[in-house]
Structures are given as structure tokens and as C-alpha cells.
Design a protein with these regions (language model features):
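Surface-exposed, charge/polar-rich loops and edge strands
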Residues: 1-351
Length: 351
């Protein structure tokens, strides 16, 4: 398939620059992945499209203040963007300007934090070894900036609005944005109706924004991300699958985690790197339904949601969303790609 097969026209004004307040007042486009039936609702209506026994899987990662500013011994200013933690002191990073930061270069960020470039990565980045006094996470909170996606140009007043309400595992360079719509009250309502929830962790990297540069989508080199699944989460998912209950992934990062850990048909507990690449023709093992935002044209995430339904249905759904003036991308509205919508566009848990 060609990357242009996943293109669509999006007016610039449809790109959301600010998060919706309250969180769950975003709009929700519900679409049946088999029939194409659609419903236009708000996110607080999501429980109406869930069934008792559904298992919702959330990514509990937290976005870190990944952008650091420092200077070399020469006084030259540099920018370091944290991507992946390798151990207590070493990180894979992006640097700017790259030519000024070769192996051996030292960077001073503050009195309590400095770093030395010790290697190159296979994606044009660097490996930096930090030296610090105190707790690294606390230093990072003081010195770093939380990065926003490049298509968001407005200033974000409350940085917690780029975090989910259930975040607890720092490590991401970008938010798992489907989760931004949930409030604590909505989560409780979903639990009270008999749904189950579990949490997995995938540290979202900047690769999530990397454009597909190859003409044929099959030739695209997929970025890697680190994920973790606890034994309790794996057991809950496998039990739900065995009992015929729906697995509802909250966000594409939850999808990547579940389908990576469940590549053999059953989810395995543990931590690992994944370069899973999901596009039409993918053989699904775990995920039945998906809560997700609207994704960029020609992106791997648009390919992923197309794999769960079909390319034609997703492009039709996106065209409908543009026409109906939905808000797009990280701070935008949401979709629920599901099953069980009957001819009246109502949920039918007994189908």
C-alpha cells in the first residue's frame, strides 16, 4: 500500500490548540468497525457504549520534562531532548545543534546537573551520561520543560492538562492522548457499571510523530518503544479473552503494548522493547475496541486504526469528522472504534 492511500484534507483551524475543559466534554465519534454505523456524542457518554464485563486497558505513563537547555565549555548553547532511559545515568537523546555535540563533549545544565556525550544512536541522536547531585527526577522537574507536539503552538497554562489523571510511571516524551479525556469521576462510573480496568506502561517516544517517508508503507522503519506488563494485568486480559469479554484499549499505545505482549495469542507479563508496526492486514490477537484521538494524515497511527476497521471506513469517518467540525490531534476530540452498535445505532451487549 502507498502512504498516499492514508491521506486526507484537514483545515488548519481543526487542529486543537487547547485542551477541552472539563476533560470529558470533548466530543466523541462512535463508529462500528464492521458496519460503519456512527454516533456523534460527548466523551462523558462513553459508558453508554460499554458493556458490563468489558476490560479497559490504560497506559499509565507520565510525560517527563524532557527538554533541557545547557551550554558547552565554549559557552555555546545546546538543547537536549530526553528520549529513552538506558540506566540510572545514561539516556538516548536528541541534541541541537548536533554538530556541536560529538562524543566526548560536555554539557552543563545547572550547578547540580551536567552530562557527557558517550555515543551515537542509530537514529541520529546521542547517548548522554548524566552526573548529578540529588534525585534526578527532582532535578528534571526543576530544570526541564514538558514538550508539546510541534503542531501545538499555543502556550499551555496548566502542564497537568498534558497528563492523564491516572499517570504514575514517568518516562514518556509525549502523552498517551486518548487518556486525556478521562476524569476520575468518569473512571469511577465505568467501574460502577461492571467494567474492569487494568494498567500497562509504554513510554511514548518522539517516533510517534515521525512521518512516513517511504512511498510504500511496508518499507517504513518503525520506531521502538519500551513497555511493561505486570503479571496481574496479563492475567486479567487473558482471563477476559478466555471468557469472551471485550478488550477495550485506551489509546494506540495500549494497543501496541497488548499486541506486542500478546503476539502468541496470550499476553505475557514482562518488559521489553517493541517495534510493532500495525497496518491493514495485521493479524489481531488481543484488542477488540479502541478509544483514540484523530491522527495525522499519512501517519502510522492512522494506519493502525485503519487496521482495526478498514482504510475506507476510517477515511470516511475522518471526512465526516472534518465536516462535523471535530477537533483533531493531541488536544482534540476522540473516537470510539467499537462493535455491537445495532441498526438503531444503540449499544447491544447481547449480540
Amino acid at each position: 500500500m502507498k502512504v498516499t492511500d492514508f491521506d486526507y484534507a484537514l483545515p488548519k483551524e481543526r487542529i486543537a490548540q487547547h485542551p477541552m475543559e472539563p476533560r470529558d466534554h470533548s466530543r466523541l465519534l462512535v463508529v462500528d468497525k464492521h458496519t460503519g454505523a456512527m454516533e456523534h456524542r460527548h466523551f462523558y457518554d462513553l459508558p453508554q457504549y460499554l458493556c458490563p464485563g468489558d476490560l479497559l486497558v490504560f497506559n499509565d505513563t507520565r510525560v517527563i520534562p524532557a527538554r533541557l537547555y545547557g551550554y558547552k565549555d565554549t559557552g555555546a548553547h545546546v538543547e537536549v531532548f530526553l528520549l529513552t532511559r538506558l540506566n540510572n545515568t545514561d539516556w538516548e537523546v536528541l541534541v541541537r545543534p548536533g554538530k556541536k555535540l560529538q562524543v566526548g563533549a560536555c554539557v552543563k545544565f545547572a550547578e547540580e546537573l551536567s552530562g557527557t556525550i558517550i555515543g551515537h544512536t542509530d537514529f541520529g541522536g546521542r547517548i548522554i551520561r548524566f552526573a548529578f547531585e540529588g534525585v534526578f527526577e527532582e532535578i528534571l522537574d526543576r530544570l526541564g520543560e514538558v514538550p508539546l507536539p510541534p503542531y501545538i503552538t499555543a502556550e499551555l497554562e496548566d502542564k497537568e492538562r498534558y497528563q492523564t489523571v491516572y499517570n504514575r510511571d514517568p518516562g514518556s516524551a509525549a502523552a498517551p492522548t486518548a487518556g486525556l479525556h478521562f476524569t476520575k469521576e468518569l473512571l469511577q462510573k465505568i467501574k460502577d457499571m461492571g467494567c474492569e480496568e487494568v494498567f500497562v506502561t509504554l513510554n511514548v517516544g518522539l517516533g510517534t510523530f515521525r512521518p512516513v517517508t517511504e512511498e510504500n508503507i511496508e518499507d517504513h522503519p518503525m520506531h521502538r518503544e519500551f513497555y511493561s506488563v505486570t503479571p496481574e494485568a496479563a492475567a486479567a486480559v487473558n482471563r477476559a479473552k478466555a471468557e469472551g469479554r471485550r478488550i477495550v484499549a485506551v489509546g494506540t499505545t495500549a494497543v501496541r503494548t497488548l499486541e506486542s505482549a500478546g503476539a502468541t495469542g496470550a499476553v505475557k507479563a514482562g518488559s521489553s522493547w517493541t517495534q510493532i508496526y500495525i497496518y491493514p492486514g495485521f493479524q489481531w490477537h488481543i484488542v477488540d475496541a479502541l478509544v483514540t484521538n484523530f491522527h495525522l494524515p499519512q501517519s502510522t497511527l492512522l494506519m493502525l486504526v485503519s487496521a482495526l476497521s478498514s482504510r475506507e471506513l476510517m477515511l470516511h469517518t475522518y471526512a465526516t469528522a472534518v465536516k462535523e467540525k471535530y477537533r483533531f490531534f493531541s488536544f482534540g476530540d476522540a473516537m470510539f472504534i467499537t462493535t455491537l452498535l445495532n441498526s438503531k445505532k444503540e449499544i447491544s451487549c447481547t449480540q
